[in-house]
Curated annotation (Swiss-Prot):
Name of the protein in its database record: D-alanine--D-alanine ligase
Database matches in PANTHER family: D-ALANINE--D-ALANINE LIGASE, D-ALANINE--D-ALANINE LIGASE A
Gene designation: ddl
Organism: Synechococcus sp. (strain RCC307)
Binding site for Mg(2+) 1: 295, 309
Single GO molecular function: metal ion binding
UniProt-annotated location(s): Cytoplasm
Reaction equation(s) it catalyzes: 2 D-alanine + ATP = D-alanyl-D-alanine + ADP + phosphate + H(+)
Length: 345
């Protein structure tokens, strides 16, 4: 394929969210896949970087950020969007690698839709439902999918409901986990084993979001399954995450040596098969497409398999499960990014 026939791919990363650094690392992996093998001829990459202040930067600056792995320092100029950098209007397919708010919540997907350009991943609805943990769990419930005990909490209840702590203790007990509804990579999440930790966890989560989720802590194995496709979805082999820390927090996820993965997970065939079917049902329940990672809790003693959450724009770093699960399923990085671009709509 000649360069004249190469499709221009807009690889957009960074973003004004707490997962900015993870996005840079994910984009570096995607860029590697786009420059490998036959993809070098198939695609011409236009890199676009969004800094922490929401400013958009063109190819030269974006490449510098990718090569250094470091976020761009704030130069004090006016924050927010001030126009597309050079090259954006040439882009034929957008490949968003933006994690967290303004990246995987339907906002950037809405912009691409307005631009009438195809893009990798879920559309506005699937992204928004998958991002908001309360909407996601409601969608899972409506589809009859198995979940652990939880309670939605509004930040306003921390002031208006004097019985909140007692109600949570009665309904869920300890340990429990407190999460903001709209952040990923375990940002703003805490574990509570007593009332003071519960109060502190609610305050922390409320500092990130007005919608919160409190979940019962369970003695489980943590499994993950990658899903790929549009109308026809396929599920990867299962992976298992183990960690030395008390729980799988942000530092554990992204610090070398604190967590380990086993791919494929050592599971009975019936459990693996059921998880793969449930993963596809979870993607359909929220209306996602393209790529998703579905996380499970497996209660080994009872054999129960519970859906924890879906991530419609999963991490793509060198230690992220999504690309590793597909590699173990016979889809290497080069082919994976190509398939995702082929699925763009």
């Amino acid at each position: 394929m000649s360069s004249q026939q190469s499709k221009v791919v807009g690889l957009i990363f960074g973003g004004a969210s707490g997962e900015h650094d993870v996005s840079i690392r994910s984009a570096a992996t995607v860029a590697e896949g786009l420059s490998s093998g036959a993809n070098k001829e198939r695609y011409r990459v236009q890199h676009v970087y969004i800094d922490r202040q929401g400013r958009w930067w063109g190819d030269a600056t974006a490449r510098q950020v990718l090569s250094s792995g470091q976020a761009l320092a704030d130069d004090g100029s006016r924050p927010g969007f001030s126009g597309f950098p050079d090259g954006c209007l040439e882009v034929e397919i957008w490949y968003p690698v933006l994690h967290g708010p303004n990246g995987e919540d339907g906002t950037i997907q809405g912009l691409f839709s307005l631009m009438q350009r195809p893009f990798v991943g879920s559309g506005v609805l699937g992204s928004a439902v998958g991002m908001d943990k309360l909407a996601m769990k409601a969608a899972f419930s409506a589809a009859g999918l198995p979940q652990g005990p939880y309670r939605p909490v509004l930040a306003s209840e921390l002031v208006s409901n004097s019985q909140l702590l007692e109600e949570l203790e009665t309904q869920l007990g300890y340990p429990c986990f407190i999460k903001p509804a709209n952040l990923g990579s375990s940002v703003g999440i805490s574990k509570a084993t007593n009332r003071s930790e519960l109060q502190a966890g609610l305050d922390l989560a409320a500092s990130h979001d007005s919608r919160l989720l409190v979940e019962k802590g369970l003695q489980v194995r943590e499994l993950e399954c990658a899903v790929l496709g549009g109308q026809h979805l396929k599920a990867s082999v299962l992976g298992e995450v183990s960690f030395d820390a008390d729980w799988y927090d942000y530092e554990t996820k992204y610090s070398s040596g604190l967590s380990s993965t086993q791919i494929p997970a050592d599971l009975p065939e019936a459990i693996s098969s059921r998880a793969q079917h449930l993963a596809i049902e979870a993607v359909q329940a929220v209306g996602a497409s393209g790529l998703s990672r579905v996380d499970f809790f497996y209660e080994e003693a009872s054999g129960n398999l519970l859906i924890n959450e879906i991530n419609t724009l999963p991490g793509f770093t060198s230690q992220s499960m999504y690309p590793m699960l597909w590699k173990a399923s016979g889809v290497p990085l080069e082919e994976l990014v190509h398939q995702l671009l082929e699925l763009a709509q």
